[in-house]
A protein has these predicted regions:
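Acidic/histidine-enriched, beta-strand-rich ligand/metal-binding domains
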Residues: 162, 197-200
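Outer-membrane beta-barrel domain signature
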Residues: 84, 190-192, 196, 203
Length: 240
């Protein structure tokens, strides 16, 4: 395939008997036509206590995937991935990345420029160093609450797959709002300690929490289905 293709992020609630097999064996490119990559994780509520039902929601599943084109997504949802059609997903084009993952090796650092005022989707994916998990939680939970409570984040959540994989997913009203949050500047007068994210990133540079860590930025194309009883998470300015 030439070019980055189309990405999706799916959210669905299923019985544990369905989610556990998907966590162990997500959809595979050799079994799903025009699928390039897929990863399934259990949802977590950002900022939830470490030991709590909200921290590991085995019935609520996220899937991050890369496809050849939108026709491949439709074929998957109409066929082998029909259970995902009962949930919610957003279709996205890749804009840029910071760092890289072995699972997504050939993406360019920047595919397209973005407008500061356009809506944006951010996905992080990391493989944890297990001895660093307590330290990661100490620095990470304040950032989780910052993103969760930010007035410009229309949807924000985290997901995990034992033992090492962790992801965050967020939709923002604008690129500017997201980058201001990342750097702890501007537009956050109503939030306590807006520099939490910048401080955590400085700590990660001092001693990394992860074997691998990458941040991806996407332009939302279209939104499908319902999550938690609602739709419309992608701001209307995205020209949906």
């Amino acid at each position: 395939m030439t070019g980055p293709g189309v990405f999706t992020f799916h959210l669905v609630e299923l019985p544990v008997t369905a989610t556990l097999p998907l966590l162990r064996r997500p959809p595979r490119p050799d079994r799903v036509a025009e699928l390039r990559y897929a990863e399934c994780l259990s949802l977590m509520r950002l900022g939830a206590p470490t030991i709590s039902p909200d921290r590991l929601q085995l019935r609520r599943l996220a899937m991050f995937a890369r496809w050849h084109d939108e026709a491949a997504i439709d074929a998957f949802l109409d066929g082998p991935g029909a259970r995902f059609a009962a949930g919610w997903h957003v279709r996205m084009t890749f804009l840029r990345r910071w760092s890289t993952l072995a699972a997504l090796p050939e993406l360019p650092q920047e595919a397209e420029a973005s407008d500061d005022d356009e809506p944006v989707v951010a996905v992080t994916l990391a493989r944890m160093r297990l001895p660093e998990v307590p330290r990661f939680l100490t620095w990470g939970k304040p950032v989780e609450r910052l993103v969760r409570d930010h007035p410009d984040a229309t949807l924000a959540l985290a997901a995990v797959r034992a033992p090492r994989s962790i992801s965050t997913f967020s939709i923002w009203n604008s690129v500017r709002a997201m980058t201001d949050m990342v750097h702890g500047r501007g537009g956050e007068a109503d939030l306590a300690d807006p520099a939490r994210h910048a401080a955590a990133m400085a700590e990660r540079r001092r001693r990394d929490f992860h074997h691998e860590f990458a941040t991806y930025r996407f332009r939302p194309l279209s939104e499908h289905g319902y999550w938690d009883g609602r739709t419309g998470y992608v701001p209307r300015r995205s020209s949906l």
